[in-house]
Amino acid sequence: MHFFKILIAAFLFIQIKVNAQQKPVLISGPWAGNVELRNATIWAEVSPQVKSVAVKFYPVSNPSLKKTVLCKNILGNDFNPVKIELNGLDFNTTYIYSLILDAKPANTSFATKFTTKDLWQYRKPAPDFNFLAGSCAYFNEPVFDRPGKPYGGDSSIFETMANTPASFHVWMGDNWYTREVDFSTAWGLQYRASRDRSHTILQRLMASMPQYAIWDDHDYGPNNAGISYIFKEESRNIFKNYTTNPSYGEEGKGIYSQFSYSDVDFFLTDNRYFRSEPEMADSAEGKPSAGKTYFGAKQMEWLKNALLHSQATFKIIVSGSQVLNPLNKFECMRLYSYEHEHLLHFLSANKISGVLFFSGDRHHSEIIKLERPGLYPLYDVTISPYTAGVSKVRDEEAKNLYRVSGTLVEEQNFGKITVSGKKNERILHVGFIGIKGEKLGEWAVKEKDLKTNNP
């Protein structure tokens, strides 16, 4: 009798699971990605059973102006990430939105709203704001993880981030970690992106502010992967489907892009799609080898021209790996001498003001300072990790003289960056924040200290 009770209980459990799987459900989201003056992108992922998706939205100040936009994606696939564009919005306006699945509102435990950017140019001072940034988010999945101590740490850091008011969030690479079972097929790559984006603890953060992202090796493919990765096209498509940047590379290549907020321009670079293998010779006949690429010629031309075009107070170049650290023996643009020297020479020759590098990857945080004769110093702000294993600096890096004193953080953290001040007196402040919201380090730079003597 006891055996039959167990059998019946097991059968009922299986039936419940099957019914749940057959029911149209929201897998993750919704959240507002790229939000502009008159446009916003709403992202979500739904189960294969969902037949239709729509977004209903209205301005908080006037609910009678309710509108509905239908999703045009083909649904019913194994994975169904969707993006819905909301156009014709008013600037500096807060909107409430809800996701509609098969004509029924999807239930969420968090607020779903966004505020369009303000049209401040030629009208008022550049708005003060803050944003969040960081890298290396690892969620454990024991059946596929390496044996031993779990690599993923305390994911409550994402709740702390959700509780930190900010205008937007920049994911600086390794936003999810593909395993051996993932990066050998396109399906596996999509599985990892879908699974890691669906974690409950992420949802409120994603919905609380617009999201922007670059990638690094682990969300691109295998460890240290670059131009030779056989699934790089599939990986690019998956990255496009699970992020909401304004654009993705040029001519169907790469994922680099750009966006602006207030008087700051962000250059989202791609350090994977065009990147040569690290083992490739860095020099030939005593000269840096042009054949060893980091950004690649096309992206480098875009970056240079975008920097020349920019009138922003601060110009933040976001890279998955460090750019400036002379003591980084692992993955760093410095190890790609031709492009590294070319970029630094370009910045100097054109006397471009306000340049800062932001990077991830290292599993610790720090700020590297590189002096330049006759010009302002360059800084590389590294913020890592969110939840991946913490790395302790060793050997000569432990006493890195290029590191700004007081900026080394060797525990889980994220960055809260504030831009404030009067015109011509703007200040950018970086705070390294711990799991519980504690301050682990800080640094600031003034606009005037990143100026060149441009005529």
What is each PLM-predicted segment?
Residues 1-24, 455:
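Bacterial Sec-dependent N-terminal signal peptides
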Residues 21-455:
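Metal-dependent phosphoester/phosphodiester hydrolase catalytic core
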